[in-house]
Swiss-Prot record:
This is Adenine phosphoribosyltransferase. It is an enzyme of class 2 (transferase). Catalyzes a salvage reaction resulting in the formation of AMP, that is energically less costly than de novo synthesis. One of its GO terms (biological process) is adenine salvage. It comes from Mycobacterium tuberculosis (strain ATCC 25177 / H37Ra). The keyword Lyase does not apply. The gene is apt. It is found in: Cytoplasm. It comes from the Bacteria.
Length: 223
């Protein structure tokens, strides 16, 4: 009887140990390491395998010539957002730069992807800054100019209180600064305190940062 009891106890302990081991293994597979702008491949040493977030962004960005109009080289971040480690690294890095925000503003359309992820990470809300005609009225509207023509951005004038809130603008790419500049003006018209902007990619040759000065601008990769 004593022997049988010992065997049963050992069996239960083995089952528990196996379950804990599998759980820990699953947890390790889900981990994303981001530290001071560095990303680690899973299962590799922090000391030997760290690569920069900028390198991750560059490796998963697709250059598309003459899109959406001839003469424009489009930076397609779709592969980056579809990669689980890439998205996790970008989210963590942008969240670090948006720390302290009461609200993040995501710019239509790709800015929505990263803004929502960052807002979730920071446990704050996300405000959708939409292209003209996409929101029910009343709205605040702002026209601006980009590399391939005029455009309009809008936010709701009712239903969302932005006055007095510290807001960080999140977008995928900073080019001439027209989109983020229009977003800033919209938010300030609503009474928000725009603390800065954070983007995944900055096209340094187009002087968007200078156009937005003195607004603090953070980018994960400068191309």
């Amino acid at each position: 009887m004593c022997h049988g009891g010992t065997w049963a106890g050992d069996y239960v302990l083995n089952v528990i140990a196996t379950g804990l081991s599998l759980k820990a293994r699953g947890k390790r597979r889900r981990q994303r390491w981001v530290d001071d702008g560095r990303v680690l491949a899973l299962g590799e040493s922090r000391r030997s395998s760290a690569i920069s977030v900028a390198d991750v962004v560059a490796s998963l960005t697709r250059d598309v010539a003459d899109f959406p109009v001839p003469g424009v080289e489009f930076k397609d971040l779709t592969p980056l957002f579809a990669d689980r480690r890439g998205l996790a690294a970008v989210t963590e890095a942008l969240a670090d730069r948006a720390s302290g925000a009461d609200l993040v503003a995501g710019v239509d359309a790709r800015g929505f992807l990263v803004a929502a992820a960052v807002a979730t990470r920071l446990e704050v809300g996300v405000l959708a800054v939409r292209k003209g005609g996409k929101l029910p009225r009343p709205v605040l509207s702002e026209e601006y100019y980009r590399a391939y023509g005029a455009a309009t951005l809008e936010i709701l004038a009712e239903g969302i209180e932005v006055a007095g809130r510290r807001v960080v603008i999140i977008d995928d790419v900073l080019a001439t600064g027209g989109t983020i500049g229009a977003t800033r003006r919209l938010l300030e018209r609503g009474g928000a305190n725009v603390a800065g902007a954070a983007v995944v990619v900055e096209l340094a040759g187009l002087s968007g940062r200078a156009a937005l000065a003195p607004l603090p601008v953070h980018s994960l990769s400068r191309l």
